[in-house]
Amino acid sequence: FAIWRITYNGGLGYILTKQSQTRWIVRFVERRGWLDAKKAPRMHAWIHSFYKTKLGAAYDMTCMPNEFNVWILFRSLVDVILLNDVTAYALFSLSHVQGLGNYGMLLFVVRWCIGLLLLAFNAWVKLDAHRVVKDYAWYWGDCFFLCLQNLKFDGVYEVAPDPMYSIGYIGYYGLSLLTGSYMVFFVSLAAHALQLLFLVAFENPHME
């Protein structure tokens, strides 16, 4: 879990900062000719097949700017990191599940009820935040190209500032309650702190 969390906050934070400032990711792909059938035919063929699978047979990568094509590739990288991050955290938490202990059935039931409520609330926060910002902002599309759209920041954005980074990680504490493990709780605190550091070090400066 630590590896995937650091990959997300440190790795993505670093390359997104460079992309935001110098178009580093796009330039990296262009230098290697991955989108050019003459310069890198095998890689181009694989990417072409990937686009057809992901976006449909009608998608023509030659009709779209490189910035958009590279962003689509980047989104898939983000999905891999996020999926492994969530899976690793879930397995880590499950490996530390505690029983009743010395606290009795009542506290056990209360702990599980609150934990499940926090997980459900976390799911709502993520889903509603995605409804508001769509894929473009969810995957940092503004680091790659500008898209003029009028966003209405309602729903979860009226509950808390930067909800995806603040209350959007309350599920960490829900699982901490479900497991009854201090180890899970302190690891969750550290992971949430890294996410807030990502917000301060990359997100806020980029938006400004």
Feature roles, as predicted:
Residues 1-159, 166-208:
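Membrane-anchoring alpha-helices and their flanking helix-loop junctions
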